[in-house]
C-alpha cells in the first residue's frame, strides 16, 4: 500500500437475498484527504460504509489499513474503532438519558459516568465542543438537544476518538448553513492533521466546497473516481 494511503478496499462484493449490493468495488482513501461518496439511493453507499465498519460481512475482496499487517476484517463497529475508523451515521446513535459530556466519553471512561461535567473535560474536548458551538450544552441531557445539535455532538464524539479515518454519512442533512460551515472548518482542520475523511452526501455544491476527490456508485458498481478540481461546474 502506498505511503500516503490510509485505507484501501479491493474487489469488495456484498450480496443480500436477490440484491447484488456491491460488485467488485475498489476504493482508496489517502491521508489528509476529504473524499466524497455519491450515488442515488440504493447505489451501495450505505452498504460500503457498513462493510467497512463491520456492520455487514462481505463475500470477497480485502480491506487494508495503514499501520496494519495484512488485510483487516472488522467483525463489529468496535473492531473498526480499534483499527482507527470512526463513523457518524445519519441516524444519531447516542444515549439520550446521558449528558452531552457523558456521551463524548462513554465507552472509554466508564468509571466516570455520572460524574463527568463540563469542568472535568480535557482541553481538547472543550475546544472541540466550542468549535461546533455546543459547549454551552455540555451538562444538558442529550434528549434536550435538537436533532441538529445531536448530530454535531455525534461528530464531536467521533473526532475525539483520535481516528485515522472519519466516515460522515450525510452529516449535513439536518444542519443549517452556519452549522455546515462550522463542520467544514473542522473537516479542514482534521485534513491538515492527516485524517482521511469519507463524506457521504447528495449535495454536489458541498463536494465542490470541501472535498478533494469524489467516488460515484451506481447499482453496486463503482462508475467513476475523479479529483474534484477536474469536475465541471454545473
Where do the protein language model's features map onto the residues?
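Glycine-rich phosphate-binding loops of nucleotide-dependent enzymes
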Residues: 2-234
Amino acid at each position: 500500500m502506498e505511503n500516503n494511503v490510509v485505507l484501501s478496499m479491493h474487489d469488495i462484493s456484498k450480496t443480500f437475498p436477490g440484491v447484488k449490493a456491491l460488485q467488485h468495488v475498489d476504493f482508496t482513501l489517502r491521508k489528509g484527504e476529504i473524499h466524497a461518496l455519491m450515488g442515488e439511493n440504493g447505489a451501495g453507499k450505505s452498504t460500503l460504509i457498513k462493510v467497512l465498519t463491520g456492520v455487514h460481512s462481505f463475500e470477497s475482496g480485502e480491506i487494508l489499513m495503514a499501520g496494519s499487517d495484512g488485510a483487516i476484517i472488522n467483525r463489529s463497529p468496535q473492531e473498526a474503532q480499534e483499527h482507527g475508523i470512526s463513523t457518524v451515521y445519519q441516524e444519531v446513535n447516542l444515549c439520550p438519558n446521558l449528558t452531552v459530556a457523558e456521551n463524548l466519553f462513554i465507552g472509554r471512561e466508564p468509571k466516570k459516568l455520572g460524574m463527568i461535567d463540563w469542568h472535568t473535560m480535557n482541553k481538547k474536548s472543550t475546544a472541540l465542543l466550542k468549535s461546533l458551538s455546543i459547549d454551552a450544552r455540555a451538562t444538558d441531557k442529550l434528549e434536550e438537544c435538537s436533532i441538529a445539535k445531536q448530530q454535531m455532538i455525534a461528530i464531536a464524539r467521533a473526532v475525539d476518538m483520535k481516528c485515522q479515518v472519519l466516515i460522515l454519512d450525510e452529516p449535513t442533512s439536518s444542519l443549517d448553513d452556519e452549522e455546515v460551515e462550522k463542520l467544514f472548518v473542522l473537516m479542514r482542520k482534521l485534513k491538515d492533521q492527516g485524517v482521511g475523511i469519507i463524506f457521504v452526501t447528495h449535495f454536489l455544491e458541498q463536494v465542490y466546497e470541501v472535498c478533494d476527490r469524489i467516488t460515484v456508485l451506481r447499482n453496486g458498481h463503482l462508475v467513476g473516481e475523479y479529483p474534484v478540481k477536474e469536475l465541471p461546474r454545473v
